[in-house]
Amino acid sequence: IQSTSMDQGILTEDSMNSFIRTLIQAGIWKNKVPKQAARTKDGMQTTVKKTEAGADAMASKDTRLSFQPIVSVDAELLRQQRRFSSPRVLLSENTPLEPPPLYLTEEPTVLNRTSRRKREGKSHRGEYSVCDSESRWVTDKSSAVDIRGHQVTVLGEIRMGPS
């Protein structure tokens, strides 16, 4: 799975649910095989029924299967799901060229980011203090709202000096 912002369509809730159902049926959601696993034999698909005698053997098989890591995803499944898009996830047959940004936080140079930011000076990008005022143009010049939220009268002229 590779992260990118290149989208081909709009992802709807129904299409995402359909995709998750496909993943569950393929047995790759949460690295588990569904409880009533479909077994294939000679190209025919049959559903295995549990009996009391074979329940313990089947449970140990299912437990063993549920902990097996999924090594790869079928390329055909990826081709079918190309129409699903997300700003954060792209299903791709190719492995990513570099690790996702989350892995970069484990590097030692990034761990000391807080103290480095303090030395560099304050950055207010994307941050707002509780006391920030809201600036707006006064268009009618007769009334406005001050920083405390009170309605005030705006003077048209301010005379300075002796009048």
Curated annotation (Swiss-Prot):
Q: Which residues are glycosylated?
A: N112
Keywords, A to Z, come to: Cleavage on pair of basic residues, Glycoprotein, Growth factor, Secreted, Signal
* GO CC entries: axon; dendrite; extracellular space; synaptic vesicle
The record's subcellular location field reads:
Secreted
List the propeptide region positions: 4-119
- Output the Gene3D superfamilies linked to this UniProt entry: Cystine-knot cytokines
Give the GO molecular function terms. Answer: growth factor activity; nerve growth factor receptor binding
The record, for InterPro entries, names: Cystine-knot_cytokine, Nerve_growth_factor-like, Nerve_growth_factor-rel, Neurotrophin-3, NTF3_N
Put simply, this protein is called: Neurotrophin-3
Q: Give the source species.
A: Eryx colubrinus colubrinus
